[in-house]
Amino acid sequence: LLPGAASVHHLTFRTLASARESYDLVVLGIGNSIFQPLLIDDLFEVLNRGKAKVGIFGTQYRELMPRPALDRLIDRLDMWYARYQDDVLMYGRGRGNVEHLGDWLIDQFPIVSPTEAGELHIGDEVWNDLPLDRTIQYIQRYGKVYSTRLHPLLCALTSANEVAYTEQPFDNQPAIVSGKFRSMLIDIFGRSWPEKTWFAVDRDAVIRYKQDVRRNVARLGGRLEAMLRNVAAAPPA
């Protein structure tokens, strides 16, 4: 999405102290979901060093999310490209700097037909052994997929006939769940299903979602290029 000549300095929430004095553009997130422990003062300090600031993330464990801290974060951003429509409705209502992006990882998953009639159960181990492309091929072989992880379920929606899921609880508090599965399903199908309930996949809805996300991502790329051009053309402060 960034111009080919862009020089990128990667930071994680554990390496914020290594931030440089200033940046033309700070991009917060890679399409992932943030939650309460990440809303720290060091994060806001790094954002202050950017001439332009963009967020590409969703939210999770919303019951634990301190609203004032999240509002403060959104206020600092020139644009927030939200992972879910729920994010926009809950935190972006009335704001001019919030747009729905979708989960751009779906563009990595082609629409295919399964070749195995059996049932695949996916847990945390799914990312341990195979390269990403092989993992995708493995998941897409099965016509019936049960997942406790979000992105394997998203992958399965492009191939499986039936899927089911279990939400991700917060630490040892099973009553508090991430909410990501529900938000993703509503974005794609306009509704959600209870945990551990098999449901048929509407492939046409998945295709429409893929197309929408691709258009949104293309528009995001154009916005980032325009931001960098404007920063380069701006007179020194």
Residue ranges and their predicted role:
Residues L1-A237:
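Active-site anion-handling motifs in enzyme catalytic cores
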